Amino acid sequence: QTRANKFMWLGTAQLFDAFAFIFEKTEAGWIWAHAYRFDETRSTFIVECSEETWRGIGFDHMSQDDAIATCERIFARHLGGNPLLTNAGHLRGSAAWINFRRVLCERWSFDNVVLLGDAARTAHFSIGSGTKLALEDAIKLAEVMDRPHIAQDRASMAEALEEYRTERHTEVLKIQNSARNSTEWFETLDRYIDFAPKQFAYSLLTRSQRVSHENLRLRDPVWLGE
């Protein structure tokens, strides 16, 4: 399933203390970034917008360098003078912009090939669970493959791989449902963007339905009490 919004995966030397959502209004419409620090010197900076805004800004006919420079201007006050970085410099024109693809495979193994992570299923980047899910897949796969004599017994191998798929598939469905809710929230941003700031923040925080009103009360009772 291919989703509606366009996004470009970038990086920056600007460091963010926590996962940040940054919204900027342009003449063509709203554009936003999902930003988070991933090591001591770099942050991920994913730029996303509707296709209408994407075309309105002119990204559809810009070179990648021009598109990055445009994003640097749009988000300048959040970048502290740092440039935006790409590891996809080989892509021409608008090819660096992607529509997210939701993937869910029914079968996770065939013969001696086993899928994990995004190869088996995807979860939208707005909930930040892709790496976590892949590592949990690897842990479960290692667990079932480490059983005695499994390599010499094809029936036991098949049972182990089905246990891996069944257990991880159930967990993945929960995450994908939350990811779908989050994806759709960003795809329909116009419904929420004119809310009062606190109402907008509440909607943003609860968009996936993984975080409920009571979850927020536990995390920040003072803010919620306001």
Annotate the PLM regions.
Residues 39, 71, 137, 168-171:
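Hydrophobic/aromatic residues within well-ordered alpha-helical segments
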Residues 143-226:
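C-terminal helical "tail/cap" subdomain of flavin- and related membrane-associated enzymes
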Residues 1-27:
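Central beta-strand plus flanking loop segment that forms part of the substrate or channel wall
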Residues 98-105, 120-132, 183:
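Glycine-rich phosphate/pyrophosphate-binding beta-alpha loops
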Residues 17-102:
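Conserved FAD/dinucleotide-binding core of flavoprotein oxidoreductases
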Residues 124-146:
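Active-site Asp-x-Gly
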Residues 98-116, 173:
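FAD-binding beta-loop-beta segment adjacent to the flavin cofactor pocket
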Residues 116-118, 136:
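Active-site flanking residues adjacent to catalytic metal/cofactor-binding acidic residues
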